[in-house]
Amino acid sequence: MIYLDNSATSFPKPEMVYTYMCDFYRNHGVSPGRSGFDAAIETEEVVFGTRKLLTEFFNGDDPNRLTFSYNASDSLNMIIQGLAEPGDHVITTCLEHNSVLRPLHHLELSGMIEVTYLPFDARGYIDPDDVRKAIRKNTKMAVINHCSNVIGTIQPIREIGAICREAGVFLVLDSTQSAGAIPIDIKALNVDVIVFTGHKCLMGPTGIGGSYVCDHVPVRYTRFGGTGVRSAQKTHLEEFPYRLECGTLNLLGVAGLKAGVRWVLDQGIETLHRGEMRLWNKLTQGLRDIDNITLYCADSDKNHNPVLSLNVRGLDSGDVGIMLDVDHSIACRTGLQCAPKVHEVIGTDKIHGTVRLSIGPFNTDADIDAAIAAMEEIASIRR
């Protein structure tokens, strides 16, 4: 199989991720922070070590403000619902994933908040000045996608963050597609909350994600339960990480995430991104010359991730995906990619979305050559 669905989940994982997860679960797979025996202490060291590693990765200050969840969707739900209050105004964009759109829409339908959805330009970018113009006196937060999972554009977060910071608006950054793909410094970007997932560019397993919440952000807890400490207290704990965590963590996921981040750092984020974008350029250039293929991407690889959406004239994207799989053993994603507003803007919502090819660190030139040849064959059906 040629795997070109890395924007959904990176695959395969680095060998050290498999090895570390297996060793961890065989030798340290017990609950942390609940007991004083050696294995429990060692497990807690892995958990805190991963908090510390990711805090440094994003240039945060306090590892306890780094909390774990199931994935980015889970954390976005907690952050959005934990910050929003009746009468608030929230800014977001038409580039967002349903992990942002649906929690906001739920609160909007209830009458609790108002939401402004900012458009993106023909190249796929948000204009920071549109953010400035959208801010009201009651704007609580802006929830913005760092990188589109459909068209791959990386947004000008530093400029957007500066505008939000000046206006006293919290910037919540969805780094699902960017964490591990490009360097992220939340201080330099003026980010107040960053949400991430482990199973994409951080090269970890599924079922693990989280957020880093800066200490000036008054997010409330929205879940209640066991924390392993101060069990006699009737109310949920206010301090981090317990404020956003309850119950036993996905310890195997935490361990795998730790190994994945280590691998990314060992390889070098810029080195990985440069290699993937070289293949993206090759793929894009190869497909531009084929009749009946429409590409949905920026005209330059600057501020771009290795994600390419396309369509074949006269063919449903799902049918193209089936042909790629059955006839060419190429795995990709088709449809709306859980980002319906993107497709409304680029005009693909009425034709069942796009075919998305997304490149990862283990793809090769041979993979790209095969993808170009396969698309040329499929496109010839409509010549």
For each predicted feature, which ranges?
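Pyridoxal 5′-phosphate
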Residues: 1-383
